[in-house]
């Protein structure tokens, strides 16, 4: 009943139900249909009465009353006159809320162009009329006339005429023989007279006939715009406005301030200018003013409307009274403070509070301590309701008083209300979903929120003054979700890697580590204990210490659940930890019977979670935390200055290195080495010294010492802290007790003089000064890093937000191949680690016995992975989000395991957002530096190869010859040495470069660490592969070759110099030729001549006439790259990969298999042609800058995908040449490498999800019978649908190839214009969408948040599914009725968000 009465007084309009939103151009009629009246005056309100002026910008007659149900003059008041229009003031009696909804309009005296369609590049008006923007502006702003109808004169259509030319033309041809116009009317008439269909037809035929690429591009661009207009039903002349809509007054309010001044929205100023100029123009036209004055006024009107829509887009910015630019309609939408990001995506919530956090070690994992005062305020509505229900108060007012007085019954009720009502805790910045979790509140005294220590890692919180916010979920559904999905006990695993995130840290680790230490010769060593009771007794009486070696009986259960006991060698401390382990057959005592470093504790928790489930894990974690704290306190581990031991050998090491540095200095002064080499050598020497000192220090701190009675001395406490993983790292210890070592300048260069002292000894003034560089740079970096990392996360979320698990299985037979990642012979990630939690694509068989290990379609868990590792499987095909064939989102089987739960992923999981968070969250830990590799600050690529395993050698693509010195030389460009174990399984693969000396052969046995090959790291050799005599060609002294004597050694070397710099040398082609016995040029095995072209700086190694054998070195080319190499690392590298940018010196990749031929060179580029083996293909040519080190010879055979020029490959090339799978593995490995360096583990599948989003588009190559144009970027899904329809109709389908888009570009090209507009470049996105009349189907998360609905993921996904089913049923019912009655039933109206300005 109450509700009905309320509804009568405050009628709620039913919310519009809609499934999609369309945006298009508004016609003048449409604008008039929205409007409630014309605004004729620029006045706003009367300064004395504060009432709105009639016909002004706030007019009550047009926009509605100011007070609810009361007209302006006060004649009609109250509800009973609802809907009456007052005859005196003309105001309708209704709710004042309509002032937020009713629009007005301004009739313009002259048409004006809409600036968005004029200036937003590419200009839509310009493209349609096929005129340049400059020309159109000349017409619009009244500089030139434009010929609209040339008649029979010599003028051309669309020709521009200046004032003079126009006059001359009128004199010459007479006024009626042609039509030329000026201003927006001219453009309007031209647009109105366009026959779009004819233009489209003409353009298509032009396209078919033209061959020039430039023209093609131009026609394509124009055709696209023309087709957009045709398809959307927009008319071109609507881009010129005759009526300007005025937004409702309450959206541009005028607020009185104290002191009789007003604060107003800038829009009012902008509208006032438009109205003033419009009225003045009307008056001038009525007065028949001279044309020049009218024109000037029209131009000013155009500028005023431009400023209203987009201030500052053209001409100077219009500023207000305080010299601040006025905020136009476009500015209202744009940027972080615009409507989209400020109000639609970021809303403030009520029922929240924030306070400082303190630690609450006695809490359970699912609890948090909430200050009473805070709880009382947050739960007020619930308390009022309970007070009412219990009869303590009858009105809200009474309840309020009771609460304010804080009566005892209020506290009792607060306890009741809070019971089992979870609250959400959030710590900013919320970088991933674990930044908001639900807890059950426990009321506490004081004013600080208590937080459970174990969840600190997830929140990245510490107790040095951090604050957290509390939010109260109000509705029952919200409470349910908080409890079931967000409770801290449900978030045990990290969504990024699947590793436990509820892991003890710091003090707790220290306590557990202390408990698990084993010491020699402790009291009670060798005792045997039957159970924990005995042990406790012995510990109390000090008969045994925590660290003594003892035997103890430990009880656990077997597979049937029966108790079994076994005696273990252990210590009392470890028995205490073991006692806490859940009793389970898969959690053996060994899990606790080891040194409790942070890593081992994490593994232990992981084991417990996998085998015992969530509840047991939570209880176990709580107990282990309490144990850790207790023993950290009892251990009394402290940090003293004397714990830092400086190694005695430091002085000697430092003096040795100083002597070395002096020697290098001397060598430099004698001219034996260059300054760069000296710098590198000195830096190298100091780096080695610093390493050695650190090693000595660690050895000394680690050393086990004994007292006189033979008992082991307590362990060094600093070592304990560092080794256990509680706090500190070896690098920090090195700075405290070793030597600080080398420092970098802000530019990234390393300062030659190191800091020899450590912090214990204290730094000298100079050393201190040098060390401040690095510290200052570190702070500056940190600030930049945070912003950059946040921006990366935002782009990632934006590109991946609509990737949701939508179906169970797409049934694809595509997938990725997973192999171990090997870095410098070390396996960094094994196959097992990579396939855990993924679905097998094919059956996985044992490589030796052929037994089936895992069936295809199995989600591989720890047990399967263990089998795969045991069997030594080296490559596994798995399903991946990248190759999933679901139309929208991904399917559960391709995605695999939900890492945060350890179970198959649920439908409706927003995997895109989780992927974005997992990659973005560790962003702040990555470095910002680009590493400058000065010379050999680190030794240039190693110069030898050692076997990383024992085994048998197998050589792939073997091409080895024995040279004159009897050494085996590698002649193959892609030769690889494999090391196999006994079972013949491949353990390691090493590429061996051309020109290396190799020491092993097929079938040899090698030991670990044995040399396999070596090469000169600083030069690349040119080898001969035939026997013969050497002859020189075009090697002319002083022009193309010169002898230089080394000053220090006096040895001369002959070096090729740049021969093109002299006029005589222009046509030379310096080369070394190997001749056969008859003195003719020898032939190579592949058929080319034995002529070896030399590049600049090549050093000759042979004399003319010398006899050579295969494998001998003819010349050496110094490697440029050894000098300096910038390595982009850290965050910039990740961003570069996700943005799919071409690296600066990118590699050139061969597109086809073929033979290399050298073409005619250009001035500073080399032309290289690949002649394909397959005669049906065309040869491909590449241009390579001459200075680049280039190692291929004429006649070399090259395979598709080989590098012609070394460097970082551009991802686009990999996609085009090697395909999607190669691209995926490249991106995944490169991105993982950056994170691995920082010790961050992220699962591959997250990167795959993002890459999937980057590959959503296809570039049309052949159009078939579709309406697409070659070069169009189309969604994969859309192309498939169109092709299906074409094939059904028996037509030719369109073809396309996948394109890789960077994440920013991909976000802007999403099918949803709302999502794109709220990301970046709002104006451009909306302009494009309006011209094309785009419809947003509201599929992603972002669009739904913006229009204020539940997101179609998680629990909201079910709702949207139900809504979809309901809609389809409605349509069925309507159809049925239609058929039954034979009458057309009106379609339910879709909400039409046709916007004019936006």
UniProtKB/Swiss-Prot annotation:
Requisite cofactors: Mg(2+); Zn(2+)
Source organism of the structure: Mesorhizobium japonicum (strain LMG 29417 / CECT 9101 / MAFF 303099) (Mesorhizobium loti (strain MAFF 303099))
Function: DNA-dependent RNA polymerase catalyzes the transcription of DNA into RNA using the four ribonucleoside triphosphates as substrates.
SMART domains on file: RPOLA_N (SM00663)
Record's catalysed reaction(s): RNA(n) + a ribonucleoside 5'-triphosphate = RNA(n+1) + diphosphate
UniProt entry tagged with the keyword Electron transport: no
Keywords: DNA-directed RNA polymerase, Magnesium, Metal-binding, Nucleotidyltransferase, Transcription, Transferase, Zinc
CDD domains, alphabetized: RNAP_beta'_C (cd02655), RNAP_beta'_N (cd01609)
Any one Gene Ontology molecular-function term assigned to this protein's record: DNA binding
Name of this protein: DNA-directed RNA polymerase subunit beta'
């Amino acid at each position: 009943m109450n509700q009905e009465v309320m509804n009568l007084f405050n009628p709620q309009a039913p919310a519009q139900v809609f499934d999609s939103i369309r945006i298009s151009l508004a016609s003048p009629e449409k604008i008039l249909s929205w409007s409630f009246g014309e605004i004729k005056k620029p006045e706003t309100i009367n300064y004395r009465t504060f009432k709105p002026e009639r016909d002004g910008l706030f007019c009550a007659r047009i926009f509605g009353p100011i007070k609810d149900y009361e007209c302006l003059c006060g004649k009609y008041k109250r509800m009973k006159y609802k809907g009456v229009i007052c005859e005196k003031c003309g105001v309708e009696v209704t709710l004042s809320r309509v002032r937020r909804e009713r629009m007005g309009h301004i009739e313009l005296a002259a048409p004006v162009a809409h600036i968005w369609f004029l200036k937003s590049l590419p200009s839509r008006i310009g493209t349609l009329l096929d005129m340049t923007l400059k020309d159109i502006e000349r017409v619009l702003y009244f500089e030139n006339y434009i010929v609209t109808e040339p008649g029979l004169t010599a003028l051309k259509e669309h020709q521009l005429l200046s004032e003079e030319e126009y006059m001359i033309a009128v004199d010459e041809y007479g006024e009626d023989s042609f039509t030329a116009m000026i201003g927006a009317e001219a453009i309007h008439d031209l647009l109105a007279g366009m026959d779009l269909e004819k233009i489209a037809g003409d353009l298509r035929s032009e396209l078919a006939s033209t061959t020039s690429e430039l023209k093609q591009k131009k026609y394509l661009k124009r055709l696209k715009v023309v087709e957009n207009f045709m398809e959307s039903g927009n008319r071109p002349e609507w881009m010129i406005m005759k009526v300007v809509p005025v937004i409702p007054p309450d959206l541009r309010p005028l607020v009185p301030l104290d002191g009789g001044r007003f604060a107003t929205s800038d829009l009012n100023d902008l509208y006032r200018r438009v109205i003033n100029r419009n009225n003045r123009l009307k008056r001038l036209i009525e007065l028949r003013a001279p044309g020049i004055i009218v024109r000037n006024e029209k131009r000013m009107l155009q500028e005023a409307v431009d400023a209203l829509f987009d201030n500052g887009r053209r001409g100077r910015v219009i500023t207000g009274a305080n010299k601040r630019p006025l905020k136009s309609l476009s500015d209202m939408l744009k940027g972080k403070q615009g409507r989209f990001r400020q109000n639609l995506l970021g809303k403030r919530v009520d029922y929240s509070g924030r306070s400082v956090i303190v630690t609450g070690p006695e809490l359970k994992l699912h609890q948090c301590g909430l200050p009473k005062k805070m709880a009382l305020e947050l739960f007020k509505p619930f308390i009022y309701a309970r007070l009412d229900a219990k009869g303590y108060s009858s009105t809200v007012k009474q309840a309020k008083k009771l609460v304010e007085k804080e009566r005892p019954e209020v506290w009792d009720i607060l306890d009741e209300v809070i019971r089992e009502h979870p609250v959400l805790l959030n710590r900013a910045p919320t970088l991933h979903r674990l930044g908001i979790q639900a807890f059950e509140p426990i009321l506490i005294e004081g004013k600080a929120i208590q937080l459970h220590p174990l969840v600190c890692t997830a929140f990245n919180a510490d107790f040095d003054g951090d604050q957290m916010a509390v939010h109260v979920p109000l509705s029952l559904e919200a409470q349910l979700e908080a409890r079931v999905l967000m409770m801290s006990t449900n978030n045990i695993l990290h969504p990024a890697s699947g590793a436990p995130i509820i892991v003890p840290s710091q003090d707790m680790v220290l306590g557990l580590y202390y408990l698990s230490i084993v010491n020699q010769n402790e009291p009670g060593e060798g005792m045997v204990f039957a159970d924990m009771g005995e042990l406790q007794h012995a510990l109390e009486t000090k008969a045994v210490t925590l660290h003594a070696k003892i035997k103890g009986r430990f009880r656990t259960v077997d597979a049937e659940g029966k108790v079994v006991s076994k005696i273990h060698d252990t210590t009392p401390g470890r028995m205490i930890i073991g006692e806490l382990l859940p009793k389970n057959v898969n959690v053996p005592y060994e899990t606790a019977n080891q040194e409790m470093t942070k890593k081992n504790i994490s593994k232990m928790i992981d084991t417990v979670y996998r085998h015992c489930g969530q509840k047991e894990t939570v209880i176990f974690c709580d107990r282990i935390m309490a144990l850790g704290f207790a023993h950290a306190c009892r251990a009394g581990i402290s940090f003293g200055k004397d714990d830092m031991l400086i190694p005695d050998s430091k002085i000697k090491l430092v003096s040795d290195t100083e002597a070395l540095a002096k020697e290098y200095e001397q060598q430099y002064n004698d001219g034996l080495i260059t300054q760069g080499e000296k710098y590198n050598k000195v830096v190298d020497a100091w780096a080695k010294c610093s390493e050695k000192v650190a090693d000595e220090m660690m050895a000394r701190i680690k050393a086990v010492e004994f007292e006189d009675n033979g008992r082991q001395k307590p362990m060094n406490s600093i070592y304990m802290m560092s080794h256990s993983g509680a706090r500190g790292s070896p690098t920090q210890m090195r700075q405290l007790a070793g030597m600080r070592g080398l420092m970098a300048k802000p530019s990234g260069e390393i300062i030659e003089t190191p800091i020899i002292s450590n912090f214990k000894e204290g730094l000298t003034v100079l050393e201190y000064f040098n060390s401040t560089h690095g510290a200052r740079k570190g702070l500056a970096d940190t600030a930049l890093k945070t912003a950059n990392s946040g921006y990366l996360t935002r782009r990632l979320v934006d590109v991946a937000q609509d990737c949701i698990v939508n179906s169970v299985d797409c049934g694809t037979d595509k997938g990725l191949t997973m192999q171990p990642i090997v870095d410098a012979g070390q396996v960094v990630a094994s196959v097992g680690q990579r396939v855990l939690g993924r679905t097998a694509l094919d059956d996985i068989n044992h490589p030796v016995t052929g037994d089936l290990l895992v069936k295809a379609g199995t989600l591989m868990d720890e047990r399967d992975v263990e089998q795969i590792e045991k069997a030594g499987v080296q490559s596994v095909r798995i399903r991946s989000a990248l190759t999933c064939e679901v139309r929208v989102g991904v399917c559960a089987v391709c995605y695999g395991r939900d890492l945060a739960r350890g179970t198959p992923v649920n439908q409706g999981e927003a995997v895109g957002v989780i992927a974005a968070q997992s990659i973005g969250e560790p962003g702040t830990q990555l470095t910002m530096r680009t590493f400058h590799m000065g010379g050999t600050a680190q030794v240039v690529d190693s110069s030898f190869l050692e076997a990383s395993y024992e085994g048998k050698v197998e050589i792939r693509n073997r091409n080895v010859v024995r040279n004159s010195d009897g050494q085996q030389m590698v002649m193959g460009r892609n030769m690889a040495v494999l090391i196999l174990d006994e079972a013949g399984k491949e353990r390691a693969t090493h590429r061996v470069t051309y020109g290396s000396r190799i020491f092993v052969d097929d079938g040899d046995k090698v030991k670990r660490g044995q040399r396999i090959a070596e090469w000169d790291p600083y030069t690349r050799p040119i080898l001969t592969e035939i026997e013969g005599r050497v002859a020189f060609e075009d090697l002319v002294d002083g022009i193309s070759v010169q002898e230089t004597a080394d000053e220090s050694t006096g040895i001369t070397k002959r070096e090729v110099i740049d021969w093109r710099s002299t006029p005589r040398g222009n046509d030379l082609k310096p080369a070394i030729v190997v001749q056969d016995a008859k003195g003719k040029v020898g032939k190579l095995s592949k058929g080319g001549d034995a002529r070896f072209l030399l590049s600049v700086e090549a050093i000759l190694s042979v004399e003319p006439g010398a006899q050579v054998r295969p494998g001998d070195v003819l010349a050496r080319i110094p490697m440029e790259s050894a000098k300096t190499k910038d390595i982009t690392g850290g965050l910039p590298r990740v961003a570069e990969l996700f943005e799919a940018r071409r690296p600066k010196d990118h590699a050139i990749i061969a597109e086809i298999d073929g033979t290399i031929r050298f073409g005619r060179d250009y001035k500073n580029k080399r032309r290289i042609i690949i002649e394909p083996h397959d005669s049906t293909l065309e040869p491909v040519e590449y241009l390579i800058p001459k200075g680049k080190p280039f190692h291929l010879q004429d006649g070399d055979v090259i395979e598709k995908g080989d590098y012609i020029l070394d460097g970082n490959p551009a991802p686009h090339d990999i996609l085009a040449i090697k395909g999607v799978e190669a691209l995926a593995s490249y991106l995944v490995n490169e991105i993982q490498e950056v994170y691995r360096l920082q010790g961050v583990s992220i699962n591959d599948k997250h990167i795959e999800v993002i890459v999937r989003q980057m590959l959503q588009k296809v570039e049309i190559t052949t159009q078939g019978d579709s309406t697409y144009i070659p070069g169009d970027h189309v969604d994969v899904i859309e192309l498939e649908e169109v092709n299906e329809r074409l094939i059904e109709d028996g037509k030719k389908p369109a073809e396309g190839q996948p394109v890789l888009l960077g994440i920013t570009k991909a976000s802007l090209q999403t099918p949803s214009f709302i999502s794109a507009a709220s990301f970046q470049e709002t104006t451009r996105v909306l302009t494009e969408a309006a011209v094309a009349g785009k419809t947003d189907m509201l599929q992603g998360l972002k669009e739904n948040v913006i229009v204020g609905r539940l997101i179609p993921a998680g629990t909201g996904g079910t709702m949207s599914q139900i809504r979809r089913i309901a809609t389809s049923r409605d349509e069925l019912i309507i159809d049925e009725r239609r058929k039954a009655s034979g009458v057309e039933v009106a379609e339910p109206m879709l909400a039409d968000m046709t916007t004019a300005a936006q």
